Amino acid sequence: RGSVRPWSRCFWSSWVGDLFTDLIGQPLAVNLLTAALQQQRLAPAYLFAGPEGVGRRLAALRLLEGVLAGGVLSSRQRRRLLERNHPDLLWLEPTYQHQGRLFTSSEAEEAGLSRRTPPQLRLEQIRNVSRFLARQPVEAERGMVVIEAAEAMPEAAANALLKTLEEPGHGLLILLSAAPERLLSTIRSRCQLIRFLRLGDADVQQVLQRCGEQKDDPLELLAMAAGSPGALLEHRRQREALPVDLVDRLETLPQEPMQALALARDLCESLDGQQQLWLIDWWQQKLWRCGAGHDPMHRLEALRRHLLGFVQPRLAWEVALLDLSVS
């Protein structure tokens, strides 16, 4: 299963050459992955390293298609990959833990769960990787595992993954990471590194056009996206989710203490922890473009550290906004 017969090698080479055509702005990654498939010399583990939203997830899907196809991939197989319900595919994301259950970011948002801290890849998730790869594949030649945000592993989970990488068997692991420097060096050394770069403006617009998502974006959102079409779409979503009255009040710094305290109260009542962290980034860009100077930027950066350090959010916002109202 999955091997290429000599008589079909020419067709296979041509098909693989077209496999990554929708991966825009990543020629180096495309060349490396295409060559690996054409020569049938896949590494046991890959590290797709680069910013969020520049095509790492799409590249992983296309590579999996190439692994499954053997020259031909049915629409049913492609749909199962996209829906992540192929029996030989395990796709992991960082999760939140609530009442003994694990929730991905999208599931936590749908369930209305409080998200004060970033999600993590849990030890039990990583242990499942080893069990998954140890079993006999159902349809494919090998078990396939994709781990998103691999840098979100605490030490115990990272050590468990390292043991799997030391004896990967016939499986294929793809780690996606926007911060590969946070991974154990021993994990990085056991993966073939594929770098993904930020896109130029023309490539960003080409991606958005293909997705039917072109529009005039505020300069602060474009700056936050920094060459990442996926990040731009996520920043749009976050911006559109903000209550309109809060956006209006954040156009300028608070002028009076009572105004600052009321804003802190309303922010904490309206936004969860992850939304508050996003808001700091957005407000910094907004104020910088309005010529607010360095002091508000430094104060908002300190606020971010306090929120990440488990300071009570409303208290952290009150102190920060009071400082900003008199600065």
Q: What are the residue ranges of the model-derived segments?
A:
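Conserved Walker B
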Residues: A149-M153, P168, P180
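Charged, glycine-rich active-site and insertion segments that engage polyanionic ligands
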Residues: G17-L82, H170-L172, S177-S327
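Conserved catalytic/switch belt of AAA+ P-loop NTPases
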Residues: A134, N159-H170, I174
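Clamp-loader machinery-focused feature within the broader ASCE/P-loop NTPase space
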Residues: G17-A156
